[in-house]
Amino acid sequence: DERPELGRYTNPGGSPSVVGSFQYYLFEKYIQPAKERGAIPILVTPIVRRDLGNNYTGESGHITETVTNEEGTFQGGNYAKAIKQLGVGKSVTVLDLTTRTKDVYERLGAQGVKERHAWTSQREASIDNTHTNQYGAACNAWFIADELLKSNCNLKNYVVANPQVPQFTEA
């Protein structure tokens, strides 16, 4: 996790051999166990967080600064980049949702993508800039299918060719 809290934080700058690094946990807790069980692991970079200023070069793009607080110093870094590096290093397919969502969010702007996000009330101030609703999830699933079809992963043979782009409908 990228939060600067002792129980949650993983260092985005460490390699898969560095205990406590983000890559270490992805490899040890997900990739290696999946491979041991005969599964084909796939890494997916995180979607960007909706940003009212349309800036995805910082935390909205999962790029953090080094933080020092009462619990210690937490090294910053680029989590999507760490996932991509791990995929290359371990020969695991990586689907880049960070870039896909960043491109769409920059093009449409914060107002243009608000219908993809969860709302806790009817007020626009209640939009959850991190979590998506059903429509946003369908859009992200479409990105995953599209990215998988472009990959060299054998699992692409199980994806419907030319999946239909999700359409937004008012509830």
Which residues does each predicted region cover?
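Alpha-helical cap/lid subdomain in secreted, periplasmic
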Residues: 1-134, 138, 142-157
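N-terminal secretory targeting modules
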Residues: 152-171
